[in-house]
Curated annotation (Swiss-Prot):
Gly residues: compositionally biased ranges: 1-12
Organism: Mus musculus (Mouse)
Key words, A-Z: DNA-binding, Nucleus, Phosphoprotein, Transcription, Transcription regulation
tRNA processing keyword on record: no
Oligomeric form and interacting partners: Part of the SNAPc complex composed of 5 subunits: SNAPC1, SNAPC2, SNAPC3, SNAPC4 and SNAPC5. SNAPC3 interacts with SNAPC1.
Cross-referenced Pfam families: SNAPC3
Family: Belongs to the SNAPC3/SRD2 family.
Designated name of the protein: snRNA-activating protein complex subunit 3
Record localization: Nucleus
Chain's role: Part of the SNAPc complex required for the transcription of both RNA polymerase II and III small-nuclear RNA genes. Binds to the proximal sequence element (PSE), a non-TATA-box basal promoter element common to these 2 types of genes. Recruits TBP and BRF2 to the U6 snRNA TATA box.
Cellular component terms (Gene Ontology): nuclear body; nucleolus
Keyword Repeat: no
InterPro entries reported for this sequence: snRNA-activating_su3
Length: 407
């Protein structure tokens, strides 16, 4: 039976869609929210059995040949069709064919710079663009919105169509690709309703541990200890080296990372809590993360799952899409999981110079106007130590890892 869940939109409660007879295909359980449970590997097999070799091929499609004779008659038919669709005259359709024809699609010469706008251009769009660029240059305007758009575009398109140098790293035809959204840790209330922190593409044949290793979280880089008496002492470990335990939760199963001897079963406390109080969640199962691929999973598209690491750093994980690989995708399997989107984070600046990113945070600091207070490395040492490196005053100092460093 489908759960009696309530929709989050203005249309009121969502009603479950009647179930079909199989679970190998993603069908909606609640409209516009999430699908029913289906098996990822069976979904891929179903489509590979339906599609032909040409549909699954990853080779570039051949360009259609241009007709060598009868071109005039074909142009006449095309002009008539365009005139009918656009509601214009045959003369206007013929002019459009001449101006917008394929022979007009030419590349720039080797000595021409595409970034330079010519002075004698007649295009209004280029004139407007040139005026904006000249205005920014004169007024030293920083277009942060444009910078973020460029960052997002480059992140999404940097690997499109990329092929591996080693043919052995080529993705197989018919491989499944899943889109995975990684949200901010639950403890960050200000990002509770925000867009995903990271969006990744993973292959169906990849193990869960490969996604686990590719997720970047600032809590993995934290450095434990207080360093006010020895700021030059290099930290021995970061949190990711000390606390290697983690798990994914998908459809009643906790997939624990047990690759290292020091890994613990973080799900045991949750399972014991559920069973001892008869919470009504049913019987949970556990498995080793390194033994399962995404093709082995039963999932719902659009349903919130869980990734937990560092003991209590919890990220909501949503699988938003599943499809077969296309020849325009990145075909180098060594680049997967492939990061395609990332939220831009503002860095925390030093309280003193307001220029550089904070590297230290202090508590109970007699030299600071607030508690806690953030400093870059230069300002921290100039304010808290003498020329010989001796500590001045009383304070507690901790290394600070700014989330903006992931930009």
């Amino acid at each position: 039976m489908a759960e009696d869940l309530q929709g989050g939109g203005a249309g009121g409660p969502q009603h479950p869609v009647p179930s079909a007879s199989h679970s190998s295909f993603p069908e909606y359980e609640l409209p516009e929210l999430h699908t029913r449970v289906f098996h990822v590997g069976s979904f891929g097999e179903l489509w590979r059995g339906r599609l032909g070799a040409q549909d699954l091929s990853l080779s570039e499609p051949q360009a259609a040949e241009q007709p060598t004779d009868g071109g005039a008659s074909n142009d006449g038919f095309e002009d008539a069709a365009v005139a009918s669709d656009l509601g214009c005259s045959l003369e206007a359709a013929a002019e459009l064919r001449v101006v917008c024809g394929l022979d007009k699609l030419r590349c720039l010469g080797e000595d021409e710079d595409p970034e330079v706008i010519p002075e004698n251009t007649d295009l209004v769009t280029l004139c407007v663009r040139k005026g904006l660029l000249d205005y920014r240059e004169e007024n030293i305007t920083i277009d942060r919105a444009c910078r973020q758009e460029i960052f997002a575009y480059e992140m999404e398109s940097h690997a499109l169509g990329k092929k591996p140098e080693n043919p052995a790293d080529m993705i197989e035809e018919g491989e499944c690709i899943l889109s995975v959204n990684i949200l901010y840790p639950v403890i960050f209330n200000k990002h509770k309703e925000h867009k995903p922190y990271q969006t990744m593409l993973v292959l169906g044949s990849q193990k869960l541990t490969e996604l686990r290793d590719s997720i970047c979280c600032v809590s993995d880089l934290q450095i434990g200890g207080e360093f006010s008496n020895a700021p030059d002492q290099a930290p021995e470990h970061i949190s990711k080296d000390l606390y290697k335990s983690a798990f994914f939760y998908f459809e009643g199963t906790f997939y624990n990372d047990r690759r290292y001897p020091e890994c613990r079963d973080l799900s045991r406390t949750i399972i014991e809590w559920s069973e001892s109080h008869d919470r009504g969640y049913g019987k949970f199962q556990t498995a080793r993360m390194e033994d399962f691929t995404f093709n082995d999973l039963h999932i719902k598209l659009g349903f919130p799952y869980l990734y937990c690491h560092q003991g209590d750093c919890e990220h909501v994980v949503v699988i938003t899409d599943i499809r077969l690989v296309h020849h325009d995708d990145c075909l180098d399997r060594t680049l997967y999981p492939l990061l395609t989107k990332k939220h831009w984070l503002w860095t925390r600046k030093c309280f003193v110079c307001k220029m550089y990113t904070a590297r230290w945070v202090t508590n109970n600091d007699t030299f600071a106007p607030e508690d806690p207070c953030f400093f870059c490395d230069v300002c921290f040492r100039m304010l808290h130590y003498d020329s010989e490196g001796n500590k001045l005053g009383e304070f507690l100092a901790y290394p600070y890892v700014d989330p903006g460093t992931f930009n």
